[in-house]
């Protein structure tokens, strides 16, 4: 799901979007890391869980976001906390585009989490 908290709450927040999901029968969500600031550190991941614990009306988890430079954050993520590691291989928010072969190799070799990817080719989309 693409909620917009923190940083982009004029588009929607955890409270409003989880209520909307419940109205449509969605009782659980894994939310994306491309917010502001991005969820590419364990500190920001923890902050999102803190926000959701106060505002969410349904079950939740969050993806840690991959980047070209955050392999050390990825290596130390609590596998019982994050749903997965989200990697954007096409255009994305902020520093979240992973276009370095070395970074991709590190992510796929060392991530303790399942890796989920956006693999679209921006020229074709």
What are the functions of these language-model segments?
Residues 1-55:
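Metal-associated gating/positioning segment near the N- to mid-region
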């Amino acid at each position: 799901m693409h909620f917009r908290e923190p940083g982009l709450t004029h588009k929607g927040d955890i409270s409003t979007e989880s209520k909307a999901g419940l109205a449509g029968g969605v009782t659980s969500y894994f939310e994306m890391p491309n917010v502001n600031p991005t969820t590419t550190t364990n500190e920001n991941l923890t902050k999102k869980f803190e926000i959701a614990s106060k505002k969410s009306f349904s079950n939740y988890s969050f993806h840690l976001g991959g980047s070209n430079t955050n392999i050390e954050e990825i290596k130390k993520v609590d596998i019982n906390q994050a749903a997965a590691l989200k990697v954007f291989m096409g255009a994305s928010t902020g520093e979240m585009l992973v276009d370095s072969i070395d970074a991709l190799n590190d992510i796929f070799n060392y991530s303790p989490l399942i890796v989920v990817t956006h693999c679209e080719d921006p020229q074709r989309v």
